[in-house]
Amino acid sequence: CFLWHVRKRVADQELGDAPFLDRLRRDQKSLRGRGSTLGLDIKTATRAGKQIVERILKEESDEALKMTMASVPASRYLTDMTLEEMSRDW
C-alpha cells in the first residue's frame, strides 16, 4: 500500500511513463485482490500507506530527495513486468 501511494504521487505529478502508469493500475487491482484473499480491510491499509507518504513529503524539504524517495520503486516495476508488457509498443 505504501509503495502504491508513492507511485501514485509520481503519476499525479505526470512523471510516469506509459509502462509505469500501466503497472500502477495493475497494482491497484492486485491490492484489492490480496485484501479480499487475506481478509484485510484494504481501505485501512491504503489509508495508512497514504499517511506515511504524506508525512515524508511534508517533513522533507529537499525536492531532489523527495524525487529520489519517490523513484525508488520505479526500478522494481520493471522487474515485475511481464514479457507481454515489455514487448508492448508504448
Swiss-Prot record:
Gene3D superfamilies: Influenza virus non-structural protein, effector domain, S15/NS1, RNA-binding
Cross-linked sites for Glycyl lysine isopeptide (Lys-Gly) (interchain with G-Cter in ISG15): K8, K29
Keywords carried by this UniProt record: Eukaryotic host gene expression shutoff by virus, Host cytoplasm, Host gene expression shutoff by virus, Host mRNA suppression by virus, Host nucleus, Host-virus interaction, Inhibition of host innate immune response by virus, Inhibition of host pre-mRNA processing by virus, Interferon antiviral system evasion, Isopeptide bond, RNA-binding, Ubl conjugation, Viral immunoevasion
UniProt region (RNA-binding and homodimerization), positions on chain: 1-61
UniProt short sequence motif Nuclear localization signal, positions renumbered to this chain: 22-26
Subcellular localization: Host nucleus; Host cytoplasm
Annotated GO biological process: symbiont-mediated suppression of host gene expression; symbiont-mediated suppression of host innate immune response; symbiont-mediated suppression of host mRNA processing
GO CC entries: host cell cytoplasm; host cell nucleus
Modifications after synthesis and translation: Upon interferon induction, ISGylated via host HERC5; this results in the impairment of NS1 interaction with RNA targets due to its inability to form homodimers and to interact with host EIF2AK2/PKR. There are two ISGylated forms.
An example molecular function term from Gene Ontology annotations: RNA binding
One of the Pfam families matching this protein, by short name: Flu_NS1
Recorded domain comment: The dsRNA-binding region is required for suppression of RNA silencing.
Family designation: Belongs to the influenza A viruses NS1 family.
Function: Inhibits post-transcriptional processing of cellular pre-mRNA, by binding and inhibiting two cellular proteins that are required for the 3'-end processing of cellular pre-mRNAs: the 30 kDa cleavage and polyadenylation specificity factor (CPSF4) and the poly(A)-binding protein 2 (PABPN1). This results in the accumulation of unprocessed 3' end pre-mRNAs which can't be exported from the nucleus. Cellular protein synthesis is thereby shut off very early after virus infection.
Subunit details: Homodimer. Interacts with host TRIM25 (via coiled coil); this interaction specifically inhibits TRIM25 multimerization and TRIM25-mediated RIGI CARD ubiquitination. Interacts with human EIF2AK2/PKR, CPSF4, IVNS1ABP and PABPN1.
Name of the featured protein: Non-structural protein 1
Gene: NS
